[in-house]
């Protein structure tokens, strides 16, 4: 029962998904819209509750057991609690019951997002430029014909795609566009076919119950 | 230490320092760099330009804070273009962590326009000229659902208004009333728009993506599934150039300002790779 | 130089520097910033799920407008929380099965249409494809190159036979196209990563320190 019911459900739900695309008839669309608009939307919201519950449990557990770096978990919980209170009671557009400004100092949820989430996330990715430069210098070696081709194509794109491409030759940007439009498309398209066939095969395996990793461990 | 050893073992701090220098100096001492638009960006610009009065444009701001630097200038350029030419525009995000960036872009451009507006007609009025639909999960719901009814999916907009009570939404009901959707993203979302909304409802999809996805997206541009394509900061700079050249819209051009830094940084990376390989060849020859 | 007096700009900048300090090595400032990020990002998420999904889509219609059909998604959704009750935790598989099943079901025809049929149409040698390049007679040449390139690339990824003879030749040609594609992707990736660094510096040097405009 613990496996049969979920496997039957995934088969039925998968079939409904396929049918919705193959038979776009209005009489069926009513049901399809209900599945998408009501069922899937609500399920996605509860999935977030599960994810959040897991995150908080991990950090409470870390504090309780005083695991390595447990002090930082307090920071996470305080930041989460503070921003959730501001968002839930202060409203999405600072329209809630909780005041979200003291004088000219605002602390509504959008302000927190713009001044904490954005700078932190963008800084994490800004680091990648340094690591990429260092890795390219250390690891990019012309050992074979394939590596040479890759390097030449990369250099042409790096130079030709920028304004300096025109300074070198007025034909260079056009040549870069040709590389992207013709040989690049041929190579990428072969990969697109491979990915698409892989997606279809995996989806079929999931719906037909051949792929069961999503059931997780246990009975 | 032999020459080839020196060439192959430059300290990472030197590499970081050089990179930081070549990126920073052109920002502090800027000079004008002429950006020439390429055809994929021109096609996108034309498609947005061709939106007729009876139709609206959807701007999907599904880019995360991590890639803000690359994609936000695209959102601002497209919004400036659409507002300047008085297109009706709907803005949305497909993921919750991205909706704050859409809010930021809209607030910035609306403020730019309204600070220069002389009359009520000139001003950008919420509900009349643009609607911020906000976000509804999971992405498949708006992608397919808006083909039937936009206000059924976005029952309330970002600000909590009932969407069907907004003036603009009286005429904009579903994809039949949309000329093009411009998907700005750092992931495979534009392909999902094609797979769901275009296949089923024939929606035209234009794309602005991070440079990481650029080469992967060309097969979809070549088939016409993507009406136009803006790739990375350079693509954003090209769109900024088109908006200013065609409509004289003045405003800070963040992507264009970055072109010189980008140029020097590319040259530095090429140099690093060349130096590493010279060391590698000398080493191989000795062996 | 015109340093910002906005306290939020200072907070953003200090948090940014804490993350960038990872370049030196992992340190407590980086770890603190990382945890603050996770906390605030999840607080933001909760806000929107409550105000824009659960309230207008579920609770208000169900409890205020009496749309009783919503009891079904509500009940199935609640099953997600059984994950925290070991004795009945298997019930979490029910909402996952419905969600994942429908999604994968829709994905199959959509993928076949968008990524296989349309891509094949863009590859075959037809007059429409020749003209789509807007390059006159060269359009035929470009289409032929794409056609040959796609076939050869596919043959490179065909591992059911040894790459000898005809397949050996086509797979060698295929790898040329793949490598050009990867090269273009690498070139663009460099641009992407540098752009993100520029964005960060534009903020630190401009909005914070006021060194640049």
Functional labels for PLM-detected ranges:
Chain B
Residues 33-50:
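Alpha-helical transmembrane signal-anchor/signal-peptide segments
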Residues 5-15, 261:
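N-terminal membrane topogenic signal
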Residues 7-8, 273-287:
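Juxtamembrane interface at the cytosolic side of transmembrane helices
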Residues 66-131:
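Membrane-embedded segments
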Residues 127-216:
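Membrane-proximal low-complexity regions enriched in glycine and acidic/polar residues
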Residues 45-73:
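Short extracytoplasmic
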Residues 225-228, 232-263:
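Short, aromatic-rich amphipathic segments at membrane interfaces
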Residues 13-28:
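Hydrophobic membrane-insertion alpha-helices, especially the h-region
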């Amino acid at each position: 029962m613990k496996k049969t019911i979920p496997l039957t459900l995934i088969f039925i739900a998968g079939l409904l998904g396929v049918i919705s695309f193959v038979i776009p008839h209005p009489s069926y669309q009513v049901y399809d819209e209900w599945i998408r608009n009501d069922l899937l939307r609500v399920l996605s919201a509860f999935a977030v509750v599960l994810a959040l519950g897991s995150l908080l449990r991990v950090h409470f557990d870390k504090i309780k057991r005083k695991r390595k770096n447990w002090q930082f978990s307090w920071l996470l919980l305080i930041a989460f609690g503070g921003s959730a209170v501001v968002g839930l009671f202060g409203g999405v557009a600072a329209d809630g019951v909780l005041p979200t400004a003291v004088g000219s100092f605002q602390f509504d949820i959008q302000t927190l997002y713009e001044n904490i989430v954005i700078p932190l996330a963008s800084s994490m990715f800004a680091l990648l430029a340094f690591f990429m430069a260092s890795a390219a210098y250390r690891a990019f070696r012309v050992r074979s014909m394939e590596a040479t081709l890759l390097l030449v194509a990369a250099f042409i794109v790096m130079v030709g795609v920028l304004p300096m491409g025109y300074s070198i030759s007025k034909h260079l940007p056009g040549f870069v566009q040709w590389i992207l439009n013709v040989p690049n498309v041929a190579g990428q398209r072969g990969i697109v076919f491979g990915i698409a066939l892989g997606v279809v095969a995996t989806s079929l395996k999931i719906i037909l119950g051949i792929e069961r990793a999503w059931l997780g461990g246990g009975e | 230490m032999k020459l080839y050893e020196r060439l192959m073992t430059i300290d990472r701090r030197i590499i970081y320092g050089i990179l930081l220098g070549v990126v920073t100096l052109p920002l502090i001492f800027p000079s004008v760099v002429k950006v020439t638009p390429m055809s994929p960006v021109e096609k996108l610009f034309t498609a947005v330009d061709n939106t007729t009065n009876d139709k609206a444009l959807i701007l999907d701001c599904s880019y995360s804070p991590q890639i803000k630097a690359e994609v936000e200038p695209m959102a601002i350029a497209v919004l400036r273009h659409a507002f300047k030419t008085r297109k009706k525009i709907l803005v949305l995000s497909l993921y919750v962590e991205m909706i704050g960036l859409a809010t930021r872009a809209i607030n910035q451009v609306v403020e730019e326009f309204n600070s220069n507006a002389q009359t009520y007609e000139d001003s950008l009025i919420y509900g009349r000229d643009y609607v911020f639909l906000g976000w509804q999960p999971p992405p498949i719901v708006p992608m397919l659902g808006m083909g039937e009814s936009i206000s059924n999916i976005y029952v309330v907009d970002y600000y909590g208004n009932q969407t069907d009570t907004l003036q603009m939404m009286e005429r904009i009901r579903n994809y039949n009333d949309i000329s093009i959707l411009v998907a700005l993203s750092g992931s495979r979302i534009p392909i999902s728009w094609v797979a769901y909304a275009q296949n089923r409802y024939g929606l035209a999809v234009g794309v602005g993506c991070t440079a990481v996805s650029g080469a992967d997206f060309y097969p979809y541009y070549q088939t016409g599934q993507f009406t136009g394509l803006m790739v990375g900061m350079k693509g954003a700079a090209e769109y900024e150039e088109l908006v200013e050249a065609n409509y004289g819209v003045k405003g800070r051009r963040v992507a264009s300002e970055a072109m010189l830094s980008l140029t020097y940084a590319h040259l530095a990376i090429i140099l690093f790779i060349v130096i590493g390989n010279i060391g590698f060849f000398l080493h191989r020859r000795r062996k | 130089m015109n340093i910002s007096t906005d306290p939020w700009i200072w907070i953003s900048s200090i948090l940014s520097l804490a993350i960038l300090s990872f370049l030196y090595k992992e340190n407590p400032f980086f770890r603190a910033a990382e945890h603050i990020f996770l906390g605030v990002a999840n607080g933001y998420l909760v806000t929107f799920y409550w105000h824009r999904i659960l309230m207008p889509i579920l609770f208000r219609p169900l409890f205020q407008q009496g749309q009783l059909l919503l009891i079904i998604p509500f009940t199935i959704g609640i099953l997600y929380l059984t994950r925290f009750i070991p004795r009945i935790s298997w019930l979490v598989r029910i909402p996952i099965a419905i969600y994942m099943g429908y999604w994968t079901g829709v994905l199959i025809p959509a993928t076949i249409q968008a990524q296989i049929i349309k891509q094949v149409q863009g590859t075959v040698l037809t007059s429409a494809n020749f003209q789509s390049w807007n390059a006159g007679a060269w359009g035929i040449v470009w289409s032929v190159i794409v056609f040959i390139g796609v076939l050869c690339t596919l043959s490179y990824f065909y591992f059911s036979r040894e790459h000898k003879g005809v397949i050996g030749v086509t797979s060698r040609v295929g790898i040329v196209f793949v490598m050009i594609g990867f090269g273009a992707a690498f070139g663009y990736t460099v641009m992407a990563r540098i752009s993100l660094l520029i964005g960060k510096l534009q903020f630190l040097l401009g909005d914070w320190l006021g060194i640049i405009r």
